[in-house]
Amino acid sequence: MKKRKFWGWGYEDQLLTEEEDKSIERRIAQNFSLDEVKSVPIPKAEEIELPKSRVSIPSNLSEVLTEDHLERLNHSYGKSFPDIARSILGIFPSPPDLVAYPKSQTEVESTLDWADQNKIAVIPYGGGSSVCGGVETDVGDDFRAVISMDMRKMDKILEIDKESRAARIEAGILGPDLENQLKEHDLTLRHFPQSFEHSTLGGWIATRSGGHYATLYTHIDDFVESTTTVTPSGVIESRRLPGSGAGPSPDRMIIGSEGVLGVITESWIRLQNRPTFRSSCSVHFSDYAQALNATRLISQAALFPANCRLLDANEAMFNGAGDGSKHLLIINFESADHDMQPWLDRALEIAKSEGGEFELPKEKDAHKSGASGNWRNSFIRAPYYREASIRRGIVQDTFETSITWDKGYEFIETLKRRAQEAIKEITNRDTTVTCRLTHTYPDGLAPYF
């Protein structure tokens, strides 16, 4: 496996270009009226001391467990702002005592049995992209030790049911590997969270991750057909069903459980044919309330665009998709079966009725060019820009929620204003709080700040 940065996002060889680094420094200097922008050096693993592991590896798990220094560093934190800041500064007070790399469900069961008998906490670990503290190994004093169980060696597609268009897939598979293996069968999952490159199927299920689709199939829930989860008390395995009305759903218990109930080892996942028809357009609005209303009307028209993301003017500007004067609505339709242009035409009619301005793109791959393409590229690169900013002393973080349409506009405007006031009070500096809608529903929206 490729070596990951223990102090930031991605692999060790994934660094910003020199020009990207300089661009970030120029922006920081301009925004904060600085003559010079200093950077904290990238930490070296060998210079960081860790407390000694509190347990020894049993002989029957010697091929599964390791106490390697770099592995313990890599599995101490997720990728939130506090996580990256502490990693860059070399602060690792509570690393895992051991790291497990199971290659089968049997090895997961054996590790959990040993841990349960010896009062050792086990934290499931996928790609380590968590920003909510889910993989942090500080568990307090109730356990003798901590194991971080990295699932990435369980990374195979075990079975494909083409007739039902579903596949049985191990939980440790990373997003790119999943799509590459499905591509051989002309199938796709098309679940693309921002962490796609460095997150796993099991992680998506455990966190109920939101993905590529802004409407309809918005979260991993919509693709999960069944799950298999190993717990200290046994295995929970749900049945493959297209739908069920028979009482509480065991999958609903596992999806979003954040690893507290057990280790997800595999899942049957609903798939799709690879899209061949695409229709896209970017719409600009001068008035945010009108832009929000256009987004609502499109969401309630049963058109179900794959992408229906509204960026406020500053969010668009920071992502290279505008100059800060207009709000931007990115609309994209896709299908493996039929031309989507009529759906796009209707969505644009709705947007125009609310003051939206647009020019129909001439390029075949319009979703990869122009304002839409700029935002797409910035979206993927954003975590790398953030870690570079953190090394230069910038506090940069995000938060999100969901709310019904009747409260949406007032909520967004009030939250942005109050966040700016709070930051001003604490730092005595002006700041910018931006917003984009990640998902939209007939009855509400999901703003991301």
Where are these regions (language model features)?
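N-terminal flexible segment immediately upstream of the FAD-binding catalytic core
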Residues: 1-113, 131-165, 313-322, 370-398, ...
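Hydrophobic alpha-helical scaffolding
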Residues: 14-18, 47-51, 98-101, 168, ...
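C-terminal substrate-recognition/cap domain of FAD-linked oxidoreductases
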Residues: 63-87, 273, 279, 284, ...
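Short, acidic (Asp/Glu-rich) active-site segment that either coordinates a divalent metal cofactor
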Residues: 131-135, 142, 146-150, 260-265, ...
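FAD-binding subdomain of flavoenzyme oxidoreductases
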Residues: 155-309
